[in-house]
Amino acid sequence: MNSEFQSLPPETQEAVKRTMDTMEPAQTPAEIRETLEGTQKGGVKNSIRNCLTVFQRDPLFRGALRLNLLTEQIDIVKPLGWERTSTTLTDMDMNYLLLYLEENYGLTSEKKVQSAIKIVANENRYHPVRDYLNSLQWDGTERIRYALHHFLGADTDEYTYEALKLFLMGAIRRVFRPGSKFEVMLCLVGGQGAGKSTFFRLLAGRDEWFSDDLKKLDDENVYRKLQGHWIIERSEMIATANAKSIEEIKSFLSRQKETYKVPYETHPADRLRQCVFGGTTNRQDFLPRDRTGNRRFLPVTVYPERAEVHILDDEAAARAYIEQMWAEAMTVYRSGKYKLSFSMEMNRYLNAHQQDFMQEDTQAGMIYAYLEDYTGDRVCSKQLYEEALGNLNSPADWETRAICEIMNTGIAGGIIQGWAAYKSPKRYKKYGSQKGWERVNQAPPEGDGFQEITEEEARQMELPF
């Protein structure tokens, strides 16, 4: 094996060696040519089978073409005799392959060659992240509990440990069982220069398995930007979200697959998700006050001045630490003793903890103030949109939902006192038939409403006339 092969990751080298050990003995082009199906005129038949035979037996190609299950592209994992700058099969590689097959075997059908390449690559498929994780050996030292403090100065409490462990287990589960339900985003909160983005980049193991290029969720190419990546950072995604976009973010995080076709494919296919998402923000109040719950977002504040080391002080040492962290996580994964969710107790803590990161809820305050002075017996969402919030246009669907959430779940999670939703639509003079809320009677005090007092208290309360 030459220097090009030696430059491959160790786990990839081992996978290539194992694949080649299971193959039939290599043959020379002359020997292989004798086994190929011929034409009536004595030539070599341009068939997929003949092309497959060459790719499986020619020493140049044996073990070279592999389908990468992370990128869903075909990789060339060993030298083929020409200069290459990418591990992925390129158009230039195809030109060299076609030239070699034409000169040595008389095979000239590009379509047949491409079909054979896809078949042989699929038979030799591999997953680089799985190979990486399976190659790790844990040294027994606990690191997950202390990693965020070690590099970023975060607290060492149980919540910080559970948040990072949950994120790691979700990432492992996604590569070993693509499409697994996991909708949690670990969010690192702190000032610039703390190393938040670097932490996620090094956490990916290889830089090519990391991406911070997912800028817009409505980009038509957004799904292709997930392909081939394991850890994806979203910087300031939530902090700049409004009520409408936060619903889009939550929906996006909840998806388990994408259905699309890549260029040159004839049929769209389901692409099961293999990635997880990490968030970074400089803003403390980055969470919208979402009354339906922010359970997907796990905020952890970082304090770089308290960190034991800056993550970029010694990148090699940081990578070694993180590699052992993954080895520890793999030990938990293999044991099967984990869940991809928080316990009820930790969820209660999360709900309280998130209050420190929530934005001011101005709309709820405006509606509450309006209702305090309102003398009518019922209200509808459109009325509140215009009269309480001061809007002149018609509300969008997401704005109507936001008002309904305020009325139904109230401020700080409690129903706005004195109002309850009615089931059947009622007619409003200005707004027509609408669902809404009606004033309800407050529960009367216990007893007759009078308080017994002593004779001394009565004398003190006597009027001076």
Task: Specify the residue positions occupied by each region the protein language model found.
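Positively charged interface segments
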Residues: 217, 265, 291, 304-320, ...
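Conserved catalytic/switch belt of AAA+ P-loop NTPases
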Residues: 246-269
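Conserved nucleotide-binding/hydrolysis micro-motifs of P-loop NTPases
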Residues: 238-239, 282-286, 303-308
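Conserved AAA+/SF3 P-loop NTPase catalytic/coupling segment centered on the Walker-B
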Residues: 231-253, 288-293
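Phosphate-sensing "switch" segment of ASCE/P-loop ATPases
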Residues: 271-275, 290-369, 373
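N-terminal nucleic-acid engagement/recognition segments and initiation subdomains in replication
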Residues: 1-142, 158, 162, 393-398, ...
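AAA+/SF3 P-loop NTPase mechanochemical coupling elements
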Residues: 222-227, 262-280
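P-loop NTPase catalytic core of nucleic-acid-dependent motor ATPases
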Residues: 117-227, 382, 389
